[in-house]
Amino acid sequence: MLKPPLPLRSLLFLQLSLLGVGLNSTVPMPNGNEDITPDFFLTATPSETLSVSSLPLPEVQCFVFNVEYMNCTWNSSSEPRPTNLTLHYWYKNSNDDKVQECGHYLFSREVTAGCWLQKEEIHLYETFVVQLRDPREPRRQSTQKLKLQNLVIPWAPENLTLHNLSESQLELSWSNRHLDHCLEHVVQYRSDWDRSWTEQSVDHRNSFSLPSVDGQKFYTFRVRSRYNPLCGSAQRWSEWSHPIHWGSNTSKENPLFASEAVLIPLGSMGLIISLICVYYWLERSIPRIPTLKNLEDLVTEYHGNFSAWSGVSKGLAESLQPDYSEWLCHVSEIPPKGGAPGEGPGGSPCSQHSPYWAPPCYTLKPETGALIP
């Protein structure tokens, strides 16, 4: 059997070796917690086979509460398995730039979910660097840089007080703890006649004046605060203060709303009752139109009584009957040649049809033809 030339044979071995590298690449065994999956196979590898070190760590959120303490928290439930992550922090470009681990962890379901830092550990105007680590995967960590002056949340205003400046003018005042010169405020108020709040911004002051109030209304006021641009660029407002009230609370409801609440049901009931009365009046005053198929009932069942058959009410039928009596009177003429007027069988020229009175009878006078009583 002939053997292929040496150059062609070496070329075939070279192609096979290249294919073997693409299909069966050998990866050295890791010494520590290295990922054993090559980078070009990550997209084709199912998510179940990914190592924990390839998963990102949750984001850390820090808030400074009234520059008294700071909480840095993260979502511990985002981990594939319960993991006690550790938090380390330091301040960039400062004298206190050494890395420190959190000394007071916050827990959620017995797993670390945050860190509490006291006032002495807070440097408000220095860059705060926070690093979250997985103790079981040293290479798995995330670092964030934060400006703490933009993360301050003040306490809600306290000691709200109202003063009467005049008969129709009120002044609202309040106090804050420790941060009066760095706060801006929002005042909301409404009366018991209003459905929504009226909002007014107040800068660098702890008071607000309302120039026109109605003593017959019941007013409610509340205030909240925020770290203003002079000291930071915080976006989070404090909680609302406890409300304070002023005015007459005898009328708890708007009179307009109260009258509507009473008049609308009464008007509806009156309309329904009126419609029922009209319906029964029409039933009694307007007879029903009989149908042709029931004409035989007029003879068989009602014996010719049209009123009963047609549905005319008894009162209406009686109202159509006359309330007087009429008498019939026969008028006769005298014979032309002195004849005696004809008398009836009873000897009277008139037929009396009533036992109470007899109507007058008239005869013709021969000369004039006029009626003579």
UniProtKB/Swiss-Prot annotation:
Glycans are attached at residues 24, 71, 75, 84, 159, 164, 249. The modification Phosphothreonine is found at residue 291. GO terms for molecular function: coreceptor activity; cytokine receptor activity; interleukin-15 receptor activity; interleukin-2 binding. Keywords: Cell membrane, Disulfide bond, Glycoprotein, Membrane, Phosphoprotein, Receptor, Signal, Transmembrane, Transmembrane helix. Its main location: membrane. Residues 1-22 form the signal peptide. It is a single-pass type I membrane protein. Residues 284-373 are cytoplasmic. GO terms for cellular component: cell surface; external side of plasma membrane; nucleoplasm. Residues 156-253 form the Fibronectin type-III domain. A motif (Box 1 motif) lies at residues 285-293. It holds the Pfam family TSLPR_D1. A motif (WSXWS motif) lies at residues 237-241. It is found in: Cell membrane; Cell surface. The gamma subunit is common to the IL2, IL4, IL7, IL15, IL21 and probably also the IL13 receptors. Interacts with SHB upon interleukin stimulation. It is linked to Defects in IL2RG are the cause of a canine X-linked severe combined immunodeficiency. The WSXWS motif appears to be necessary for proper protein folding and thereby efficient intracellular transport and cell-surface receptor binding. The box 1 motif is required for JAK interaction and/or activation. Common subunit for the receptors for a variety of interleukins. Probably in association with IL15RA, involved in the stimulation of neutrophil phagocytosis by IL15. This is Cytokine receptor common subunit gamma. The lineage of its organism: Eukaryota, Metazoa, Chordata, Craniata, Vertebrata. The gene is IL2RG.
